[in-house]
């Protein structure tokens, strides 16, 4: 199932990029709808063969998959999803963080090596989690947020859900013992536990990550979630 969904995500992103440079006619749109229907039919057959799924539960899950994929397609077509987007000014960054359901924002300096490293990881996740916006903003362009969030160490990453801060990363300290890097799976799992990225169908599970540790860390923060208080 994971491979099928990943192929669909890749196809949607690829088609969206082509659409920016060409006029989309009705036949192309119909083809996209047929591809979605074909994928859903394949998943239906696959789930039907999986004895772990009870029939009623299988139908519910299939509907969830359908809704999720349609939302993914809409997000990509509306732009802003599927990539790490550079935001040029503070006002736009604030609006995105307060108005978007799920967003991960990286406060960075492009000349700082660790920020470049973080950008690579976030770019990777942005292509896989198409219901979350991933953005980056230069700290020199957002003095209000730098002061508000008390940003003193870079990279500085914050995850918001419905305008509420769910998780933050100051440097790499929460992502392992290596001060110069981290396993992307740690960041992925931590964001998932915080509710900032969603893997609705639990198709990506990494047993190498200590999930209880992340759950405990994010539970502590959830008790004191804060918004931007603009």
Swiss-Prot record:
Keyword Cytoplasm set for record = yes
Q: Where is this region: Thioredoxin fold?
A: 81-230
**Source domain of life:** Eukaryota
Q: Name one GO cellular component term.
A: cytoplasm
Question: What GO biological process terms does the UniProt entry carry, in alphabetical order?
Answer: cellular response to pheromone; negative regulation of signal transduction; positive regulation of transcription by RNA polymerase II; protein folding
* Gene3D superfamilies membership: Glutaredoxin
Keyword Translocase applies: no
Q: Name one GO molecular function term.
A: G-protein beta/gamma-subunit complex binding
> Which residues belong to any copy of the Phosducin domain?
16-166
Positions of post-translational N-acetylmethionine modification: 1
UniProt-annotated location(s): Cytoplasm
User: Which InterPro entries does the record associate with it?
Assistant: Phosducin_thioredoxin-like_dom (IPR024253), Thioredoxin-like_sf (IPR036249)
Task: Please name the SUPFAM superfamilies in this protein's record.
Answer: Thioredoxin-like
Keywords per UniProt: Acetylation, Chaperone, Coiled coil, Cytoplasm, Pheromone response, Signal transduction inhibitor
Instruction: Indicate the segments annotated as coiled coil, or none if absent.
Output: 25-79
Question: A single Pfam family, by name?
Answer: Phosducin
Which family does the similarity line name? Belongs to the phosducin family.
Cited function:
Not essential for growth. Inhibits early G-protein signaling events following pheromone stimulation. May help create heterodimerizable beta-tubulin by facilitating the efficient transfer of nascent beta-tubulin polypeptides to the folding apparatus.
Quaternary structure, per UniProt, is: Interacts with the G protein beta-gamma subunit complex (STE4-STE18 complex).
Question: What other note does the entry give for this protein?
Answer: Present with 2250 molecules/cell in log phase SD medium.
Q: What is this protein called?
A: Phosducin-like protein 1
